[in-house]
Design a protein with these regions (language model features):
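Acidic, Mg2+-coordinating active-site environments of NTP-dependent enzymes
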Residues: 55-63, 169-320, 345-346, 367-379, ...
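Residue-level signal for inorganic ion chemistry
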Residues: 26, 45, 79, 94, ...
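ATP-dependent carboxylate/acyl-activation modules
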Residues: 94, 308-310, 425, 429-430
Length: 433
């Protein structure tokens, strides 16, 4: 059955999973979700122009445009694996606690100066998104950049069985999704699934030389592989260190845009956050490895402008908004606050939303953020039930963004620099609607 589906996929190489966004002559996969069951929309998909439908609905067994399978999701994943094995191009896998999407976009921007690049759309980085990304790669593409996310143990290793990365980047490892991982050690081991996959095929790892954990893990895992097999040709390209790195650089200003020194030049970017220096150096390192010129790398970095509520600078009247509310965890929240305090601005305010998926660690991690803001004497407005449990007389707490919005709209702030950060589920974007 898989071979038949793949044969048709080669003729109609577009996948659809949502009848509201169906593409004519695509193959519709009837995926199940918490709120929907695609198997209920077979006829609708065909009426809207799907060429074929992959479904678990046995009543369509004899339909000439339907493939009836036991498990649609597994079929999608196997199809992606088969397609990946037919591709003869570099596939760069990216994971990490923070910075995955920004790094992915920077790498794509840099490599696109020279190559036809396909990369993960948005943050489709899970057990559905990674197969869809692989299946979107065509024979015209020369390099693929695949983002991989995880919220439970061993998930990255699973995603690598679809992507088969030849090159790998772990941006960093911090506390996130602790509800699913249960411990920091489990987070480390899960992220290292990418290193293991690349090492297995003697690929190339791009490693932040300042991150001692990543350096140790990369070297140790290569040595372990060599002892087991007797051979391993995995390369490590270090970036961000002073001792003969592939690429290094430094932050020279944050106003709030980030200015960096790289290739003996000052470059002003369109993103904020000193923490983004590592992401830029990673992209530059990969660009140089693949033969992109330094001038092209600089052009790509300067022209990259985020529009995804990550490290984004906006204006609200004459106030400057640091919009970083796509997601949040303890590590990224701490980094955002510390970076915010480095910005050259006279009047600063922080609007911080809850951090989700922390399980039993939630109360302690939220309290650490409140204490950090108090240490900086930062005027802060905390939003969400997790922060509200820590309510005291000296800090501003609001149970929801809706309760804060009316207050926010009547602040009449003037020439303030405002950090807005929190988990997606807090819906901080409502403040600007």
């Amino acid at each position: 059955m898989i071979s038949e589906i793949y044969s048709q996929f080669l003729n109609y190489p577009v996948i659809s999973t949502d009848t509201r966004k169906i593409i004519p002559y695509s193959i519709f996969f009837c995926l199940k979700g918490e709120q929907f069951d695609g198997n209920l929309f077979v006829n609708q998909a065909l009426e809207l122009g799907a060429k074929f439908v992959v479904t678990e609905n046995s009543s369509f067994t004899d339909h000439p445009q339907c493939f009836v399978v036991k498990n649609v999701l597994e079929t999608l994943q196997i199809l992606a694996t088969n397609h990946r094995l037919e591709l003869k191009i570099p596939v760069i896998g990216i994971t990490g606690t923070n910075g995955k999407t920004t790094t992915k976009e920077l790498i794509t921007k840099v490599l696109s100066q020279k190559y036809n690049v396909q990369s993960t759309v948005g943050n489709l980085n899970n057990h559905i998104g990674v197969p869809l990304t692989i299946l979107s790669i065509t024979k015209e593409h020369e390099i693929a950049v695949v983002e991989m996310g995880a919220n439970h143990v061993n998930e990255i290793s699973e995603l690598c069985t679809f992507a088969y990365p030849t090159h790998g980047v772990v941006t960093n490892i911090g506390n996130a999704h602790l509800e699913g991982f249960k411990s920091y050690e489990n987070i480390v081991e899960t992220k290292m699934g990418l290193y293991d996959a690349v090492i297995h095929d003697s690929g190339v790892l791009f490693v932040n030389g300042k991150d001692l954990l990543l350096v140790k893990e990369a070297k140790t895992r290569i040595e372990t592989s060599f002892k087991k097999t007797g051979h391993n040709n995995t390369q490590i390209q270090f970036y961000g260190v002073d001792q003969d790195p592939f690429i290094n650089g430094s932050v020279t200003a944050i106003d709030p845009y980030l200015t960096i020194q790289i290739f003996d030049q000052q470059i002003k970017t369109q993103i904020t956050g000193a923490y983004n220096l590592d992401n830029i150096l990673c992209a530059a390192s990969i660009g140089r490895f693949f033969g992109v010129s330094d001038a092209q790398i600089i052009e790509a970095i300067q022209s990259y402008a985020p529009n995804n509520q990550r490290s984004q600078v906006k204006m609200l009247g004459n106030n400057t908004i640091i919009a970083d509310y796509y997601n949040a965890n303890p590590t990224s929240m701490k980094a955002a606050i510390e970076n915010f305090m480095m910005i050259n601005a006279s009047e600063k305010v922080a609007v911080l939303g809850d951090m989700f998926e922390l399980g039993d660690f939630s109360s302690d991690e939220h309290e650490k953020i409140v204490n950090l803001c108090n240490e900086f004497h930062l005027e802060t407005y905390f939003i969400g039930t997790h922060f509200s449990h820590l309510k005291n007389d000296t800090t501003h707490f609001f149970e929801s963004v809706d309760k804060f919005k009316s207050v926010f709209e009547n602040m009449h702030w003037n020439k303030k620099t405002i950090l807005v950060k929190g988990s997606r589920g807090v819906h901080l974007e409502k403040l600007f609607e």
